[in-house]
Amino acid sequence: MLSAIDAIVSRGGRVILPAFGLGRSQELLMLLAGQGYEVWLDGMGRDIARILQKHPGALRNVGGLNHALKQTRFVRHWRMREQALRGDVIVTTAGMLSGGPVMHYMQELRHDEKSALFLTGFQVPGTNGHQLLETGRMRMERDSESPAFRVDCEVAQFSLSGHAGHAQLLEFIRACDPERVILYHGDDRQPLADDLDCEVILPEEGVPIQLSSSS
């Protein structure tokens, strides 16, 4: 991903990195630290970073985060977003383009072919981010019924998964030795269900399931 960012910045463009507020935003800042970019942080990730700094015992690499934050410029009010747009990289919520400051930045940059939006997290089908990957168009408002507009800037997705893989999930579930497992989130749940030696429920969105404790 860093080489892709280099290419965009070298040609005079700006990079928007939509990110989940907790974890991914801070991870990206640490990845970008020391690379020579002018990095701005906006949205919920900014507020969470401040909270994490107050609780260093909850972090595995508090030094790395503090180092990254010292090199990061914070968007403290909406007027500063114009300053952020003159920088190199903007890390902002929401990670699936469901709202937040990223909407403002995309309004400004969506027709700038020198710039780019790089998605770094899973995009749930039906979300704005998933629609952008599939169609090249995205909504500029939170309302799911609002019209979708063409995006001309470069769009790409990079895998920085914060989730366990198939083998890790199997190991964890087997260690718990459950009677029943409910698999809800994921691209393809059936292969994992097939590898489990217990009752597996694959609920559909909007369909209630009834749970009863065994006697």
Q: Where on the chain are the PLM-derived regions?
A:
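Acidic/His-rich, metal-assisted hydrolase cores and their charged scaffolds
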Residues: 1-215
